[in-house]
Amino acid sequence: MRKALMVLSVAGLAGVAFADGGDYGLLIQDGKVVTGVGDHDEQVIENIGERVFAADMSLVGPNWFADEPGIFIEAGSMPDNSGIGFVIESPVMRWDGTGDVDFSSMSSAPITLEFGPNSVSSSMFAGDVAGFDINYDADNPSGFDEHWDVLLDSSAGTGIYLMQLRFTVGGFEDSESTWTVFNAGLSEDIHDAAIDYVETVIVPAPGALLAMGGALVLGARRRR
């Protein structure tokens, strides 16, 4: 059951398309959080090791909005009352959808993740931003299926936005970095091209994106 208190209640939001057809699926392997593709309908996690996810955003009021991907954990697969958390690892990057895929530009606005009273926004500078925890009830026969609200100020403009984060569970090693490719108002062909780029270029060499983000931040500081 979703416990998230939806900030926005809008009928007919655009459907969400996933590169991998599901939520962030979390499990524990050898003492470490591992990601895969969560299917809450079938109550399974597939494609273990998947680290690239995707969603479409809808323009709702002053924000681009999504409530996907959610987080899915199989019933009884983690200690009861574990805190399921996350860390946003870098500023959100943006590609305007023209020319070759290029995530060298930082978004002019942060992405904010909200779940009930909890809220955290990505940084405009290099470095980690600690998120919040959501309680895991191991006794829920339907498993853990929670969805936060993803908000991006519409002033950032249409584009493809790339969010990098890792997941945390108390008592276990954090997950590897994951990347979520959000489509704000562009075609699915452009979205697919961005997803392919992240899967083939950024995931094998994540340090390249971190270096780009760091260079942008340093440049912004020098210009002040």
Predicted regions located by residue number:
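Sec-dependent N-terminal signal peptides
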Residues: A4-L13, A211-L216
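Mature extracellular "passenger" or substrate-interacting domains of secreted, surface-exposed proteins
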Residues: D20-I202
